UniProtKB/Swiss-Prot annotation:
Complex and partners: Binds to monomeric alpha-tubulin.
Family classification: Belongs to the TBCB family.
Acidic residues: bias regions: 237-254
Principal subcellular localisation of the protein: cytoplasm
Biological source species: Saccharomyces cerevisiae (strain ATCC 204508 / S288c)
Function: Acts to sequester alpha-tubulin from interaction with beta-tubulin, raising the possibility that it plays a regulatory role in the formation of the tubulin heterodimer.
Gene that produces this protein: ALF1
Phylogenetic placement of the source organism: Eukaryota, Fungi, Dikarya, Ascomycota, Saccharomycotina
Alphabetical list of PROSITE patterns matching this protein: CAP_GLY_1, CAP_GLY_2
UniProt keyword Glycoprotein present: no
UniProt GO molecular function: alpha-tubulin binding; microtubule binding
Protein's name according to its UniProt entry: Tubulin-specific chaperone B
Length: 254
């Protein structure tokens, strides 16, 4: 375990975190303390004893691979983690602007933070925002159920076939379906491993040191949700279609 002081606009608290966390898990822990959405986080990690910066992310950036270990947690007994919300319109930034009489450097417990009227997580829980939105969570559960059925009934038998991959409205990319199944990560449900003819992906077919297909050339593989995969007909497979890739970050592609 590593002792961490977590600072944001609305809270400064201490926690002990496992030093075996992945980057994705680390961001999720920070979300539950600060209320800042993972995609909006700017993170700076410093050693507590000399204030030296050992890790940081930039505004609008993303981890090169969120499934890698958070190596900065290893070998360090005490750290300071500063979380800044890069989204000026976010709830946490609005509450920080409105908050009065809250000493910014006061160390409080997570329980005291949650009890505060200005707590971002309190606001989200009260208003059903983000992960506390029951309707949204129900919709996600329904999508996951549809994914499972689609993968089981159509995609498993189509491994090796050409497909079209469309993630979050980005331009379609042609690929070959290489894998259907779970991932060795803390993500739920079935995923599809695809191989692109060009470096339009996220990895080489390996996740967390486990080879799920390939390995292929670096950047030629990705794992996407089943709903992002459309198996091409025989006629479409033989036709030449230009492969266009927009560099769009999405939780539905790893």
């Amino acid at each position: 375990m590593v002792r961490v002081v977590i600072e944001s606009e609305l809270v400064r608290t201490e926690k002990e975190l496992p030093n075996s966390l992945k980057l994705r898990q680390f961001k999720d822990r920070l979300y539950h303390v600060t209320g800042v959405e993972p995609e909006d986080m700017e993170i700076v990690v410093k050693r507590q004893y000399d204030n030296k910066e050992i890790y940081s992310t930039k505004k609008g950036g993303a981890y090169s691979n969120e499934d890698e270990d958070a190596n900065f947690l290893k070998g360090e007994e005490e750290l300071i983690v500063v979380v800044t919300d890069s989204n000026a319109q976010s709830i946490s930034n609005q509450l920080a602007t409105q908050a009065e009489g809250i000493p910014s450097m006061e160390v409080i417990s997570e329980e005291d933070y949650l009890r505060r009227d200005q707590s971002v997580l309190r606001w989200k829980m009260a208003h059903g925002y983000g992960r506390f939105n029951a309707a949204q969570q129900s919709q996600r559960a329904a999508l996951a159920k549809q994914d499972e059925a689609y993968a089981r009934e159509q995609l498993t038998a189509a491994i090796g076939r050409h497909c079209r991959v469309t993630v979050d409205g980005s331009a379609p990319r042609e690929a070959i379906l290489r894998y259907v199944g779970p991932l060795p990560l803390d993500v739920m449900g079935t995923w599809c491993g695809v191989e692109f003819p060009e470096a339009a992906g996220k990895n080489d077919g390996r996740i967390n040191g486990v080879t799920l297909f390939g390995p292929v050339a670096p950047g030629h593989g990705s794992f996407v949700r089943p709903r992002a995969v459309e198996i091409l007909s025989k006629d479409e497979e033989s036709a030449e279609v230009e492969d266009v890739h927009d560099d769009v970050e999405s939780d539905d592609e790893i």
